Amino acid sequence: MKNFDNTYFQNYQFAINSLPSVSCIIDGKVMKPGEHFLVDAACPDVKGTFRLLPFSYTNAVDKELLFAKLKQGLLPNEALLMKNAEDNRQFRRFVDTLDSMGFKIPLIVKSVSKKLLWTTSQQLEKIPMLTFPDTIIKNTDEITVDIDSKFIPAYGCRNIIGYLPGKNKNTKGYVVFTAHYDHLGMLGNNAYFPGASDNASGTSMILSMANYYAKNKQDYPIVFILFSGEEVGLLGSKYFVEHPLFSLQKIKMLVNVDIMGSAEAGITVVNGEQFKSAFDQLVDINKREAYLPEIKIRGKAANSDHYFFSEAGVPSIFIYSNGGPGYYHDVWDKPNTLNFKNYDNVAKLLVQFIKELK
């Protein structure tokens, strides 16, 4: 494997909020972060025992009562228990509105019926916020929390890049395989988000492709890129597009893979509508070889590291597998939950796709 500019690494930095220590106690029971509750990724420090005041921000009457209470002022040991907070973006806008109005809120506790999904944040909010399933928090009157946050304005990260030279030195253009190797990390000292499906499985696929092409050289160079910063907002791939180690115009096709651990129901091709000939080629190969039960098409989406390449005019598709238990951005996304059904067949499909690439 060769490198560009005498290094396999591309270093850069971004801001990130971290939560090195979190604890929560309800009715004398220690709650497990990641399983029983989540701390908002942008949460500041908060410590104390709080009495929960229940409101529904989607109910007009409750909303009036809420604003009346906020105008009166919350005590330092009072927290808002917000029910029916299912739409995270809508609720965040609501909280931002409360903050912009100058209300002092010691703590917000969200109650949701759907599964807990964690994320990351590049900023530190003023109002601490926790999320619980309805089943845990609905009959709770009091909560004790101790959350320590650490905002890092310039966290060092790196992309990993290498390539295999082509057999024909006169052949112009690269084929590029990409995946992100980062995930969410830790929430406190004990809650680990493994990211087996998202995206250790995609990283594994890149290594599988590199192993194959190291033994089966092509006429043209093949580049392999593992991005960091995907979970923070596609930052690694954005940085690479803005600071490319080779001309992006030389890329014949970029294939980004994510969530490759369970393809019993086939795969989906994002940007398939934008690059229909590439999608049709994948479908034609699959009809001949019967690698997968189905290949679905999707349009443009800023949901993985292909995005900024395609925005820069690079022919780019993003492939993810369909099937498996569906663990995603949670503490249950572990290696033993992946069955790797059709994993080898996805690799064979990609090899044949590149072989027939025009």
Question: Where are the predicted features?
Answer:
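Structural recognition of the beta-strand scaffold that forms the well-ordered cores
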Residues: 8, 78-82, 105-109, 161, ...
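Second-shell loop/turn segments in exported
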Residues: 39-40, 52-60, 81-86, 93, ...
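Noncatalytic luminal/extracellular "stalk/propeptide" segments of secretory-pathway proteins
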Residues: 1-79
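Solvent-exposed loop/turn segments at secondary-structure junctions
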Residues: 13-16, 85-88, 112-115, 168-169, ...
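Metal-dependent peptidase/peptidase-like ectodomains
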Residues: 218, 227-327
